[in-house]
């Protein structure tokens, strides 16, 4: 398995030569540096610890500073592990275009937007109650929780009952997305479809678990004029 980390920039769209529109999520992936290496002999599993998003010393505590000083690497805001990556040593810089290729199918993991304490209608898509008799607010209540029905049913609310509660802020993996293209001039990658989470949130890109060898073909329309500075466009 191969993996790398970045931050979500936002969504846009690109077009293929046949006119097909592809919605893509732009992920900024600066080079990740190997800060620590785990081995099966010493730690029981193979993995690399990657640092990304450089930060100042003032934003880190003493144990973190000591960890980076021992590895003789830059200071990073985030440290994350990727299991199954072997053959790397401390200090190596990993680039997304070197780990993956255009069209490769990948799995993307991110944390969804937190929505706080939410009612059952928004959280579980429950049906709203009838509004025909001016009942006030109870039309948004969740209704019966089916406790104490007698017989074989226990006299309590069953575990896992869909009710109001905390919604969002969950780690979600979206499988079988594909890399549409790379933008090395801005250290970014275009991934097909939507990725959970807010802009500037962490994103983990790994080899697809179900389709590790699948590579798709994209023939994108490249607007060369748009990629030039504004002054050069005006002269043309």
Curated annotation (Swiss-Prot):
GO terms for molecular function: rRNA binding; structural constituent of ribosome. The keyword rRNA-binding applies. The keyword Transmembrane does not apply. It comes from the Bacteria. Coiled coil: none annotated. GO terms for biological process: translation. Keywords: Ribonucleoprotein, Ribosomal protein, RNA-binding, rRNA-binding. InterPro entries: Ribosomal_uL3, Ribosomal_uL3_bac/org-type, Ribosomal_uL3_CS, Transl_B-barrel_sf. One of its GO terms (cellular component) is cytosolic large ribosomal subunit. One of the primary rRNA binding proteins, it binds directly near the 3'-end of the 23S rRNA, where it nucleates assembly of the 50S subunit. Part of the 50S ribosomal subunit. Forms a cluster with proteins L14 and L19. Belongs to the universal ribosomal protein uL3 family. NCBIfam families: L3_bact. This is Large ribosomal subunit protein uL3. It comes from Mycoplasmoides gallisepticum (strain R(low / passage 15 / clone 2)).
């Amino acid at each position: 398995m191969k993996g790398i980390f970045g931050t979500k920039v936002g969504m846009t769209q690109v077009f293929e030569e046949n006119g097909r529109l592809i919605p893509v999520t732009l992920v900024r992936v600066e080079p990740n540096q190997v800060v620590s290496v785990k081995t099966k002999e010493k730690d029981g599993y193979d993995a690399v610890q990657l640092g990304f998003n450089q930060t100042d010393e003032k934003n880190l505590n003493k144990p973190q500073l000591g960890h980076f000083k021992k590895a003789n690497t830059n200071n990073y805001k985030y440290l994350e592990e990727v299991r199954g990556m072997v053959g790397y040593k401390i200090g190596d810089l990993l680039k997304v275009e070197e780990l993956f290729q255009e069209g490769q199918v990948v799995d993307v993991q991110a944390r969804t937007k937190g929505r706080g304490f939410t009612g059952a209608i928004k959280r579980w898509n429950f049906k709203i109650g009838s509004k025909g008799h001016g009942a006030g607010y109870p039309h948004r209540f969740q209704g019966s929780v089916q406790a104490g029905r007698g017989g074989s049913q226990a006299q309590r609310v069953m575990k896992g009952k869909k009710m109001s509660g905390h919604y969002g802020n969950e780690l979600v993996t979206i499988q079988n997305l594909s890399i549409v293209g790379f933008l090395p001039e801005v250290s970014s990658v275009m991934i097909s479809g939507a990725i959970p989470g807010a802009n500037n949130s962490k994103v983990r890109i790994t080899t697809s678990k179900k389709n590790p060898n699948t590579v798709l073909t994209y023939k994108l329309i490249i607007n060369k004029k748009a990629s030039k500075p504004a002054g050069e466009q005006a002269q043309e």
